[in-house]
From Swiss-Prot:
Protein name per UniProt: Lipoyl synthase
Location (main, coarse): cytoplasm
UniProt xrefs under CDD domains: Radical_SAM (cd01335)
Lineage of origin: Bacteria, Pseudomonadati, Pseudomonadota, Betaproteobacteria, Burkholderiales
Family of this protein: Belongs to the radical SAM superfamily. Lipoyl synthase family.
Source organism, top-level taxon: Bacteria
Catalytic activity: [[Fe-S] cluster scaffold protein carrying a second [4Fe-4S](2+) cluster] + N(6)-octanoyl-L-lysyl-[protein] + 2 oxidized [2Fe-2S]-[ferredoxin] + 2 S-adenosyl-L-methionine + 4 H(+) = [[Fe-S] cluster scaffold protein] + N(6)-[(R)-dihydrolipoyl]-L-lysyl-[protein] + 4 Fe(3+) + 2 hydrogen sulfide + 2 5'-deoxyadenosine + 2 L-methionine + 2 reduced [2Fe-2S]-[ferredoxin]
Group of enzyme by EC: transferase
Cofactor annotation: [4Fe-4S] cluster
Binding site for [4Fe-4S] cluster 1: 75, 80, 86, 315
Pathway linked to the protein: Protein modification; protein lipoylation via endogenous pathway; protein N(6)-(lipoyl)lysine from octanoyl-[acyl-carrier-protein]: step 2/2
Length: 335
């Protein structure tokens, strides 16, 4: 990975910093300790291209409902390439606790800044929206909230409770941050309102954490997944990584082994795509045959489900990923 650690190198000067404003692109990545050096972009192979269709009526209906209830989706904030398909099918991944993250991960397109106070009406608005959309399966995720004493776990729990009250048959997957320095408290809180699927992404190989996930720790994230599983052995745990950031195939396989060693049941692997020229460069486009190899190895390792492919994202077809896993969670194999 081409990274600049020389403070004397010729990088653009940082604009005036206003922590209350949401920073995206260069305004966000210019302040990380290890600078991203622009590289010539690799041409996209045919298999990586998304088939763009005309937005459906359902697409606009969901957007209107989200805006009316002051809700945010990670689909929009992270510039997910699958947004048209998912919205068109009536599914969305809800992002709670605002749209400003306290971290500056240079692979991610979610904005950075000083988060706003929690919206006390958000759990109710979220639950009403899910009920109005008649969703059978929902994914709730969030920005990192290092400013909160519980890392936002209490807000997650309240959202789960309200959704269950209004939509008792809806299955709930949560995609959580690492609750850095607050794991004990967060697990204590989530223990009172556990989800149907617990998801926390490792994102990449540990060798690349300093560049790709500043402020995060690989072993800490694995421990979060293992400790949750110990508290809820019948609740599936899930994690995902991106490929194309500079990892090797062996590193991908080792991350998968580490997941299984920490009792992770479900896996997602997808191709990293640059949100903009200010983000980490794509170092390789992984061939479909290699994705197939990852998938085959995943099932050999004992994963209950593996969603693996170029356009796979953590929440993409999450309902299909979880189908049959949640129902048979108590019979899942564990190493």
């Amino acid at each position: 990975m081409t990274i600049d650690t020389n403070p004397e190198s010729s990088t653009p000067s940082a604009p005036a910093y206003n922590p209350s404003e949401k920073q995206k692109g260069s305004a966000k990545t210019i302040r990380i300790p290890i600078k991203v050096v622009p590289m010539e972009r690799l041409p996209k192979p045919d298999w990586i291209r998304v088939k763009a269709g005309s937005p459906s009526t359902r697409f606009y209906e969901i957007k209107d409902i989200l805006r009316a209830n002051n809700l945010v989706t990670v689909c929009e904030e992270a510039s997910c390439p699958n947004i048209g398909e998912c919205f068109g099918k009536g599914t969305a991944t809800f992002m709670i606790m605002g749209d400003k993250c306290t971290r500056r991960c240079p692979f991610c397109d979610v904005g950075h800044g000083r988060p706003d106070p929690l919206d006390v009406n958000e759990p109710e608005n979220l639950a009403k929206t899910i009920a109005a959309l008649r969703l059978n399966y929902v994914v709730i995720t969030s920005v990192d909230r290092d400013d909160l004493r519980d890392g936002g776990a209490g807000h997650f729990a309240e959202c789960i409770r309200r959704v269950r009250e209004l939509s008792p048959n809806t299955r709930i997957e949560i995609l959580v941050p690492d609750f850095r320095g607050r794991m004990d408290r967060a697990l204590e809180i989530l223990n009172l309102a556990p989800p149907d699927v617990m998801n926390h992404n490792l994102e990449t190989a540990p060798r690349l954490y300093k560049e790709a996930r500043p402020g995060s720790d690989y072993a800490y994230s694995l421990n979060l997944l293992k400790r949750f599983k110990a508290l809820h052995p019948n609740t599936p745990t899930k994690s995902g990584i991106m490929v194309g950031l500079g990892e090797t195939d062996e590193e991908v396989l080792q991350v998968m082994r580490d997941m299984r060693a920490h009792d992770v049941d479900m896996l997602t692997i997808g191709q990293y795509l640059m949100p903009s020229g200010d983000h980490l460069p794509v170092r390789r486009y992984v061939h479909p045959d290699t994705f197939k190899m990852y998938e085959e190895e995943a099932y050999k390792m004992g994963f209950a489900h593996a969603a693996v492919g170029a356009m796979v994202r953590s929440s993409y077809h999450a309902d299909q990923q979880a189908h049959g896993v949640t129902a048979g969670a108590s019979q899942l194999p564990h190493d």
